[in-house]
């Protein structure tokens, strides 16, 4: 590859995309700087010179956010970037998934792809720039990568598809799709949608693929110009004689073990065969490398037989038909003190989801590279080791947990009521209690049940299903509701979530080069049938959201005040609002438009806080009559509190009908008197009169007496 700087450009969605090579990070195997609008991402690819002694391909993809990219300095004491944000982790996964299938089987050299986001233009996706940069860095390097790949985001506005929509266009779009693939086929899909029909989602995917083909042609030109010759790498292979010997010893028993229907019994049967074979070679004092190869051969025997049974004999490991869903069981309201809970079980996969409602002040604050500053709906996914009968240290969420949580969030967000209709922050936590495949989709079903149990007025209930594929040559079988073994040994994990009306989320990962339109279409239609079946089951448990919230959920009052009065409610240094909170124990959130949200478990305290705020923002009008308490006495008159935060002066001359020599002769501090507003001066000071009311009362009494005498 030439070490001179070279620049290549293409138009992408009306904005220029530029690739620079030969100037930066020249010690990496491959490096490019991708500029898309004002977005800039440095993508590098590096590989170890020797293969690693592992039984998998050690690929790592990093998407590194730098806050300088948006002109921010990190918060806190350290003032530097810490652990990756959730968005960065999701972007890393997004790039990893279409790249991983395009390395040869048996390639064991460690590969690291690093994307550093250096400048961000919000209308030009840094994730898409990083995906193209990752593919290109690998393609121009000497690493044996069988790409290139490319990705595109697709939106739909007023029925028209849009490539790489701007921030403004994304707000109007009912589809948020990321699609990636080679020039021949799609190999990754990630989407959120507002209950969009399957046919429309398929059209959006194919629309994105047309743009992908153009970007791949652009990359091929660059590879032709500056690409290095691919290095010769020895792929991991098992010894042919050992392969034959192990197969003769284990194949027959392994085939029988695979057809045991129950998961744990099947695993025990397979492990028994493995144990017998391993012990045989240990008795012959085989070295670690030989034992590693034996394990590899045994794994291949299982994989080949499972795939043969599914594609040729149409038999699944647990005996189900291709489109058959495992037995379903659901329950709601199983945790008394939570705001809502839902238990969803599908075969040996089980998720318990809990819904917690909070005030709008409980929103998650986001401090990243995006324009979004907060979110009021969250879904978190936990996968403890006991769910698969294993032991391992309990640590924080990993990439997988964050990815599954985000998928559930994307699937459910389109049906969450607006802030205006339901002024709550909603947090869902899904605890996976048992796992045998499709746990992310079980968490979506459990979360729907939990929100309905909590009384969240969902626009429609959502269910999810994971589809699988086993493809050998031109023959393939699509599987509904895949279990763990089918996911692990199959070619596709295609998760589809949605309502009865349409799709709300898609996620597709594949282990082969790509999928045709026909397979995608068939998988989507088969998923729809399964999803509706699951929805009908869920609705048989709870038909609609509860009409009342849990007694332990916060009650929220919404009121509107004049925006000019917000400062009065808050007070100097927050003194006034803190006083209300201290007095009532409520949470108060005030929007810039004057909308006020008051929340607490105690409705009585909510009402009290509302009354205090109403008094603070209340406008005094001339002619109004108040019953107020005397707060202060001066020589010239008495100050009377009309309502919280508002006083007025009754001048000594307005205290009584007769002349008053001393204020204390008429009123004392703490007395409650009735007064009338007679004037509000230019400085906003309120002048009151007791005398006017006394005179009016005197006149009424005189009129009554006169009428009485006339009647006599």
UniProtKB/Swiss-Prot annotation:
Gene3D superfamilies: GHMP Kinase, N-terminal domain, K Homology domain, type 1, Nucleic acid-binding proteins. Its EC number is 2.7.7.8. Mg(2+) binds at residues 487, 493. Residues 554-613 form the KH domain. Keywords: Cytoplasm, Magnesium, Metal-binding, Nucleotidyltransferase, RNA-binding, Transferase. Its cofactor is Mg(2+). It catalyses: RNA(n+1) + phosphate = RNA(n) + a ribonucleoside 5'-diphosphate. GO terms for molecular function: 3'-5'-RNA exonuclease activity; magnesium ion binding; polyribonucleotide nucleotidyltransferase activity; RNA binding. It is an enzyme of class 2 (transferase). SMART domains: KH, S1. Pfam families: KH_1, PNPase, RNase_PH, RNase_PH_C, S1. Residues 623-691 form the S1 motif domain. One of its GO terms (biological process) is mRNA catabolic process. Disulfide bonds: none annotated. It is found in: Cytoplasm. Belongs to the polyribonucleotide nucleotidyltransferase family. Involved in mRNA degradation. Catalyzes the phosphorolysis of single-stranded polyribonucleotides processively in the 3'- to 5'-direction. NCBIfam families: polynuc_phos (TIGR03591), PRK11824.1 (NF008805). This is Polyribonucleotide nucleotidyltransferase. It comes from Bacillus anthracis.
């Amino acid at each position: 590859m030439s070490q001179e700087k070279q620049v290549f450009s293409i138009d992408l969605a009306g904005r220029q995309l530029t690739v620079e090579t030969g100037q930066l990070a020249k010690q990496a195997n491959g490096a490019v700087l991708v500029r898309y609008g004002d977005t800039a991402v440095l993508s590098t690819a590096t590989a170890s010179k020797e293969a690693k002694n592992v039984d998998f391909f050690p690929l790592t993809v990093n998407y590194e956010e730098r806050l300088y990219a948006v002109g921010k300095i990190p918060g806190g004491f350290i003032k530097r970037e810490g652990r990756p944000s959730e968005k960065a982790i999701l972007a890393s996964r997004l790039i990893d998934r279409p790249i991983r299938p395009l390395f040869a089987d048996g390639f064991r050299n460690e590969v690291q792809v690093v994307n550093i986001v250096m400048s961000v233009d919000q209308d030009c996706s840094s994730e898409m720039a990083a995906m193209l940069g990752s593919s290109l860095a690998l393609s121009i390097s000497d690493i044996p990568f069988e790409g290139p790949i490319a990705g595109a985001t697709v939106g739909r506005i007023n029925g028209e598809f849009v490539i790489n929509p701007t921030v403004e266009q994304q707000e109007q779009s009912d589809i948020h799709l990321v699609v990636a693939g080679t020039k021949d086929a799609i190999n990754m899909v990630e989407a959120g949608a507002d209950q969009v029909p399957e046919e429309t989602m398929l059209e959006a995917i194919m629309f994105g693929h047309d743009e992908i083909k153009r970007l791949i042609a652009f990359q091929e030109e660059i590879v032709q110009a500056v690409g290095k010759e691919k290095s010769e790498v020895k792929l991991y292979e098992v010894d042919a004689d050992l392969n034959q010997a192990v197969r003769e010893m284990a194949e027959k028993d392994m085939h029988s073990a695979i057809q045991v229907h129950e998961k744990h019994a099947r695993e025990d049967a397979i492990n028994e065969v493995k144990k017998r074979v391993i012990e045989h070679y240990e008795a012959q004092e085989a070295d670690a490398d030989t034992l590693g190869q034996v394990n590899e051969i045994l794994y291949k025997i299982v994989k080949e037989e499972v795939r043969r049974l599914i594609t040729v004999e149409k038999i699944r490991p647990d005996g189900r038909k291709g489109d058959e869903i495992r037995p379903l069981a659901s329950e709601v309201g199983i945790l008394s003190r939570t705001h809502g809970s839902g238990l969803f079980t599908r075969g040996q996969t089980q998720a318990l989801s809990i819904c917690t409602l909070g005030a709008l002040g409980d929103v998650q604050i986001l401090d990243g590279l995006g324009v979004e500053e907060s979110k009021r709906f969250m879904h978190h996914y936990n996968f403890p080791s006991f769910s698969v009968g294993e032991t391992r240290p309990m640590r924080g969420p990993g990439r997988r947990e964050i990815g599954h949580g985000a998928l559930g969030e994307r699937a459910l967000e389109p049906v969450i009521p607006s802030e205006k209709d339901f002024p709550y922050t909603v947090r869902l936590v899904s605890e996976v209690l048992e796992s045998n495949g499709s746990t992310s989709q079980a968490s979506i079903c459990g979360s729907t049940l939990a929100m309905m149990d909590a009384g969240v007025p969902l626009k429609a209930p959502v269910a999810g299903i994971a589809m699988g594929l086993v493809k050998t040559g031109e023959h393939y079988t699509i599987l509904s509701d895949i279990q763990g073994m089918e996911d692990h040994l199959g070619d596709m994990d295609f998760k589809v979530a949605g309502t009865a009306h349409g799709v709300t989320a898609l996620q597709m990962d594949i282990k082969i080069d790509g999928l045709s339109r026909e397979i995608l279409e068939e998988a989507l239609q088969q998923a729809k049938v399964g999803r509706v079946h699951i929805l009908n089951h869920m609705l048989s448990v709870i038909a609609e959201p509860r009409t009342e919230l849990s007694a332990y959920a916060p009650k929220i009052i919404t009121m509107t005040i004049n925006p000019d009065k917000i400062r009065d409610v808050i007070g100097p240094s927050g003194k006034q609002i803190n006083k209300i909170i201290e007095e009532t124990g409520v949470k108060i959130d005030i929007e810039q438009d004057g909308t006020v949200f008051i929340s607490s478990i105690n409705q009585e305290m909510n009402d009290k806080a509302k009354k205090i705020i109403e008094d603070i923002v209340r406008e005094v009008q001339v002619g109004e009559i108040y019953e107020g308490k005397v707060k202060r006495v001066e020589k010239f008159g008495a100050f009377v509190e009309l309502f919280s935060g508002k006083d007025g002066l009754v001048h000594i001359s307005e205290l009584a009908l007769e002349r008053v020599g001393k204020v204390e002769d008429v009123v004392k501090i703490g007395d409650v008197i009735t007064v009338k507003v007679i004037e509000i001066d230019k400085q906003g000071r309120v002048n009151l009169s007791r005398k006017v009311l006394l005179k009016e009362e005197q006149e009424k009494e005189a009129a009554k007496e006169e009428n009485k005498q006339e009647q006599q």
